[in-house]
Amino acid sequence: MIAVDNKGSYGEGLPPYSGAAIQVKNLWKKYGDTEAVRGISFDVNKGEIFGLIGPDGAGKTSTFQILAGVMKASSGAADVLGRPARQMRSQSGYLTQGFTLYPDLSVAENIRYVGALRGIDPREIDRRGQSYLEKFDMLRFRDRLAGRLSGGMKQKLALVCALVPEPGVLLLDEPTTGVDPVSRREFWDALAHLAAEGLTIVVATPYFDEAERCHRVALMHAGTIRQIATPEQLRNSLGLVRLELFTPQLAETELMLSEHAGDGSIADVQRFGDRLDLLVKRPEEAKLIVAERMAAAGLDSAEVRTDMPTLENVFVVTSRKLGEEIHAVPFPHRRDHHRLHGQVAIGARGLTKEFGGFSAVRHVDVQIRYGEIYGLLGANGAGKTTTIKMLCGLLEPSRGEMALAGQAGGFRSREVRQRIGYMSQKFSLYDDLTIAENLDFFSSVYGVPHQDRPEKMRWILSFSGLDGRQGQMTGSLPGGWKQRVAFGSAIMHEPSVLFLDEPTSGVDPLARRAFWSMINQLADRGAAVLVTTHYLEEAEQCNRLGLMVAGELVAEGSPAQIKAAQKGHVLEYVVDQPQRAADFLRIEGERWRVALFGDRLHVVTDEDALGAEQATTAKLNAFGIRVFQVRETRSSLEDVFIGIVEKARLEGKIGAEE
């Protein structure tokens, strides 16, 4: 739980300042002949959460470093609280992508160390540290080693360390990479509270579901800002409607409709795990055109739903107009797994793993077929990592039966290993080798024929956007580029079974589309793909999903089936005091049912939608909160996931982190 005091203490000790908290005017940053930031201008208001969205190399990190005062601009102005950013370094809390806690120090010791570096009195450090630990429900962990915290708790501790100096602005560069959905929502709830108390927050994120939680968003491209608006304004600016087509013939329908994309009737076609998304100007006309084309191609008719565009749609369409879209590079296929299509590639019955008296995985039954993309989801500690290690033969189960790539045993044999591709989140490449040396090593490990290696390596370099840079040290690559090389290394031998652990973590939106286009190609050619991801917007790309809670598989089906199976409605409220309304409703009911998305409030109810809307509106009005608009919106996978996890917690199946 996050306590609220509304002290408004951020930036204390400074003379009163009533203007925009951040003012950027005609800002430029050059590195030699490279223009990383090109004349950008924007303001950020006090108490605002402002998002910076853009592909790798757009200039986001350079902008952050200038705002934090750690790097000089080439020209232009960047003011923080009315003064040049270089003079206000003590008033900027900057959480970088690579922010490192000290794993061998306790939570309290990490806080004291950071406070001491900023010259804060030790007693004041302890007072502030205790206050923030209470605010973020972490006080009971103050003596725990930072290295023993979950990913979400580590991010909260990093946030506390950034807040101890009580900055006037907070700069967060991709703060939730690798954090599970429950922890991400808690982190963003914390940011919303801080903003309501008057702290100005600027966030860079590659994930559009997070951008939806910002008050305003700036779209960056090649060092420039193309658009600044609220998420709703950005969606409306497209002038397009999104059609969701549900059909079992995804690949065939995508290929047929993609040939017509851009002809005036269809602006974009994007494939997901159980549907296609089309962007169209005139939805009713487009529905008729799509139905006619599908019938002419001999394809089954599709169920069609209408919805608003997403922020990702805005970003992709804008990028395409600017010529920034990443086009899929044809993969040099040498193998075809079509003959295996539909057979079981990964199977488990009664899979159980115990460590001493602790059951990490209990009685899991799963079948993943060739040609299928299966997503395994779960919060930290749910058992999915242990399950994957067993399914790919790295860990012996305590009980249960398994089959992998047509074998019931001998999973570590060379024969089985050469049928499998594995991309680990924590280790995939050797940083002290060049890109070419890494690719040469993995091509040898996976047994890629010598005559095929040059072509496969050229493909990986092209797919990764690293043509001509094969001699570069791998450790010098930004995270997104390194992920692309690691993915290429895992598929160069064209495995029939592919394990991907957080494959697009930290990858920019355009590259993420290219990733999934390639994953779909592999599945279309018969490969079985098992994916883990913490980003539920991305889980929509899977054909089927399995959701784990407390070591058990509690839900399974297509994304649409999982959402449809969960009871309840999601109501979106536009009110005059969103944070106060959220705090009030969380006290009135279960906290997980309420979430802030910028200035909009989402409330999950199991009751009749109309009755719940009227009752909640009456409560808010009685509490002095004006309700301007209410509408029912569709449940997202995040809503469903968090609902399942929190209900399991209420039933005592899982507990709070200890």
Annotated model-derived regions:
Residues 170-173, 498-501:
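Catalytic Walker B motif of ABC-type/P-loop ATPase nucleotide-binding domains
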Residues 112, 116, 123-141, 440, ...:
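Conserved ABC ATPase "signature" region
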Residues 76-88, 400-408, 415-416:
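Conserved ABC transporter NBD signature motif
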Residues 145-149, 473-477:
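Conserved ABC ATPase signature
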